[in-house]
């Protein structure tokens, strides 16, 4: 049976994001992936912050200064017969809720682990978010050209800490200065590593078969014997790859390599193309929407301001769930019930914006937005429904915002509410006083907010520490008990940017005690947009 042209386009799409701890090599791997997709000709490794050859996926002024990728950009490139959409996730200490939310817009994730360090804190947090939707995960063990921990030990740590089974697809031969390449367990081939070829795609020398005498010549007798011994152990002790379990988010295929040396990245990409799901169905408040449906639907997962310093615009990033976007089509913005004609949607090659004529499920398009679009907005061809599963996450860091000029309180509030609708920060207004508290997931968000308040709203503000450890959205089905809870805890209650009641806890101990005291009240860590 031949698929219709529309379904052929859907079947080509793969949409994924990379999750890692800062400095595990995420930006480098992004560069190399784009190199294989021929989207850039030579990879501009992210050098020291002063260097002029900035990596392609880092943009916005503050990023250029700090050498980090703050804003979640989107890159589309062809690979084999597929079209891959890679959503970049800010990786530094200065990442934000955008990073979390981006993970709700992809069908698959690539987890990059520094094989010398193993599982790190940020990776744990991001994996928790992928668990909300049981997203399939591929794993790349990076930095094999350095001295690493025992690969078996690192895989055990992944299984233990991230609660996901590991199925090695390739296995390293040596590491550091002795790194010779990898063996592919399912193709029975050895791929040999050459140093100094990191900026280009290299022809890799292949030795066919583990028992091939050429192996000794290529890697030396000692490493060849060691490899065969290790593989007996690996085959006995590790899981076999199972596609069904991978799609359910229960097992991850593991690839070894070095992103900086541009080795092993293509094995991982081949696995992604072969195993990652096509665009997946998504839930709305009324029904499940399948990618095969021909009527257009999509949702906004992120809004970014000033992608173009020359134009002070905001761009809303929309993930297409079903149907085909065509230039000039009329779409309904469901939340406000208004029809809009969209003739200037954008596609992205990090920072290079180009107008898009058409887009299919799995693609990300940018909509120009002058403050009318919010995170979580659903666009359809008329059907009244709302996509679910695009959450707000309870902030982990809090500051009080203070004005230099007290007469600008109104502009400050307007600016903060708009920034919170964009997902740049969350704002809380305590019920018992006139403070304005902002909450974020990464420290840099506070600097971004102060800079944007000044440039976009002409408000000079400073932030200072505040005695808040965490926040939870509260609700209760028993009106009487809820009233009593509100009366007795007024000093800890606040309204967020969308006027939702929030409990602001000065310490985790306070939160735990309050939760025990009021078992009928629900304290939530995430809230639907």
From Swiss-Prot:
Keywords: Cytoplasm, GTP-binding, Nucleotide-binding, Protein biosynthesis. GO terms for cellular component: cytosol. It comes from the Bacteria. It is found in: Cytoplasm. GO terms for molecular function: GTP binding; GTPase activity; guanosine tetraphosphate binding; translation release factor activity, codon nonspecific; translation release factor activity, codon specific. Disulfide bonds: none annotated. InterPro entries: EF-G-like_DII, EFG_III/V, G_TR_CS, P-loop_NTPase, PrfC, RF3_C, RF3_dom_3_sf, RF3_GTP-bd. GTP binds at residues 20-27, 88-92, 142-145. One of its GO terms (biological process) is regulation of translational termination. Pfam families: EF-G_D2, GTP_EFTU, RF3_C. The keyword Protein biosynthesis applies. Residues 11-280 form the tr-type G domain. HAMAP family: Rel_fac_3. Increases the formation of ribosomal termination complexes and stimulates activities of RF-1 and RF-2. It binds guanine nucleotides and has strong preference for UGA stop codons. It may interact directly with the ribosome. The stimulation of RF-1 and RF-2 is significantly reduced by GTP and GDP, but not by GMP. Belongs to the TRAFAC class translation factor GTPase superfamily. Classic translation factor GTPase family. PrfC subfamily. This is Peptide chain release factor 3. The gene is prfC.
């Amino acid at each position: 049976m031949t698929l219709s042209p529309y379904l052929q386009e859907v079947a080509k799409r793969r949409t994924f994001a990379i999750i890692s701890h800062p400095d595990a090599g995420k930006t480098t791997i992004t560069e190399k992936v784009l190199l294989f997709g021929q989207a850039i000709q030579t990879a501009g490794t992210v050098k020291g912050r002063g260097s002029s050859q900035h990596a392609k996926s880092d943009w916005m002024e503050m990023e250029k200064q700090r050498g980090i990728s703050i804003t979640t950009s989107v890159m589309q490139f062809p690979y084999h017969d597929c079209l891959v959409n890679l959503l970049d996730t800010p990786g530094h200490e200065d990442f934000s809720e955008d990073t979390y939310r981006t993970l709700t817009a992809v069908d698959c994730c690539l987890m990059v682990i520094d094989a010398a360090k193993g599982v790190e804190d940020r990776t744990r947090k991001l994996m928790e978010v992928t668990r909300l939707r049981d997203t399939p995960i591929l794993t790349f063990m990076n930095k094999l050209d350095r001295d690493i921990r025992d690969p078996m030990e690192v895989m055990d740590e992944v299984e233990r800490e991230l609660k996901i089974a590991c199925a090695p697809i390739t296995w390293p031969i040596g590491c550091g200065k002795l790194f010779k390449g990898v063996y592919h367990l399912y193709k029975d081939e050895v791929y040999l590593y050459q140093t100094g070829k990191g900026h280009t795609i290299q022809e890799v020398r292949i030795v066919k078969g583990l028992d091939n005498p050429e192996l000794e010549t290529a890697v030396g007798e000692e490493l060849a014997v060691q490899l065969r011994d290790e593989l007996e152990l690996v085959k006995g002790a590790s899981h076999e790859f199972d596609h069904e379990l991978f799609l359910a988010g229960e097992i991850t295929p593991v690839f070894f390599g070095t992103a900086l040396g541009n080795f092993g990245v293509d094995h991982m990409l081949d696995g992604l193309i072969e195993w990652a799901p096509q665009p997946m169905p998504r839930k709305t408040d009324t029904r499940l929407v399948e990618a095969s449906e021909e009527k257009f639907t999509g949702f906004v997962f992120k809004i970014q301001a000033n992608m173009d310093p020359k134009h002070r615009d905001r761009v809303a990033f929309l993930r297409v769930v079903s149907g085909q976007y065509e230039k000039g089509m009329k779409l309904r913005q469901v939340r406000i019930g208004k029809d809009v004609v969209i003739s200037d949607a954008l596609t992205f090659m990090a920072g290079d914006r180009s107008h898009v004529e058409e887009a299919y499920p799995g693609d990300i398009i940018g909509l120009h937005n002058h403050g009318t679009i919010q995170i979580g907005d659903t666009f359809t061809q008329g059907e009244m429904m709302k996509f679910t599963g695009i959450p707000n996450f309870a902030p982990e860091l809090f500051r009080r915002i203070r004005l230099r000029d007290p007469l600008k309180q109104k502009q400050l509030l307007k600016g903060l509410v708009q920034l919170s609708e964009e997902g740049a920060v969350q704002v809380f207004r305590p019920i018992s006083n006139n403070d304005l508290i902002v909450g974020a997931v990464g420290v840099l968000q506070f600097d971004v907010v102060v800079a944007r308040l000044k440039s976009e709203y002409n408000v000079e503000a400073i932030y200072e520490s505040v005695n808040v450890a965490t926040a939870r959205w509260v609700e209760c089905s028993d009106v009487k008990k809820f009233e009593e809870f509100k009366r007795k805890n007024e000093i800890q209650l606040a309204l967020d940017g969308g006027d939702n009641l929030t409990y602001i806890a000065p310490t985790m101990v306070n939160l735990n005690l309050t939760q025990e005291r009021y078992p009928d009240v629900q304290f939530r860590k995430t809230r639907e947009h």
